[in-house]
Amino acid sequence: VETRRITVLSAGLGVPSSSRLLADQLAAAAERQLAAAGYAVHIETVELRDLAVDIANNFVTGYAAPALAEVIAGVEASDGIIAVSPVFSASYSGLFKSFIDVLDPKALEGKAVLLGATAGTDRHQMVLDFAMRPLFTYLRTRTANTAVFAGPQDWGSNDAGGSALSTRIERAAGEFAGLLQGAQPRQKPATLESLPFEQLLAGISGRP
């Protein structure tokens, strides 16, 4: 049985947070759909809030503390990423972006990604397509077409809102699972040979 490794990144700040709640539901739906397709699934959930100090220190020291280094290694070893951020000032949170910035620029290349966002008003739902998706496109990920936004009406006793959210989650998880079913083992990039500057110039000019 093939195994698919998924890292879930939740950038929620509260305990509990709506971002974590959405992340858990997305992960559970993806696990169900992959299991139905015959895959074993390993899920690692990361609360970025717990790494906030280590992330900040990494920027000024260039050193990743053991806990942060372990999470980075887990992300790099994953087949897929579920990334959920709260919305602040019409974009993803600073904590979320800071974690992405400490990763190697090629760490997410080729990985399947499922995006989610939460906010206190529906006015922020476009953040998925105007902020988060461009970020992951730049990082060359394979991002599910459907991203999931959850606002206040999607939680609590509103049955209609909860049903609509569940439908969006199942659709997005299905697309994500489809990307993971086609995932290939990630190959390390070929090591580039470092040549003397004079030799590089000679190659450009055609001289031996």
Protein language model features and the residues they cover:
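N-terminal beta1-alpha1-beta2 submodule of the flavodoxin-like/Rossmannoid cofactor-binding fold
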Residues: V1-V84, A90-K97, T191-P208
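A short small-residue
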Residues: E2-S10, A112, V148-S157
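A generic structural signal for short coil/turn motifs at secondary-structure boundaries
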Residues: V15-S17, D122-Q125, G156-S157
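Hydrophobic alpha-helical membrane-association signature
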Residues: L22-L26, L128, A172
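Generic secondary-structure signature for well-ordered alpha-helical cores
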Residues: E31-A36, T137, T141, G174-P185
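Mobile beta-alpha loop/short-helix "lid" or hinge segments that flank ligand
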Residues: E44-V53, Y138-G156
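Helix-loop-strand module that forms the ligand-binding subsite of alpha/beta enzymes
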Residues: Y63-L139
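Glycine-rich phosphate/pyrophosphate-binding loop and the adjoining helix
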Residues: N145-P208
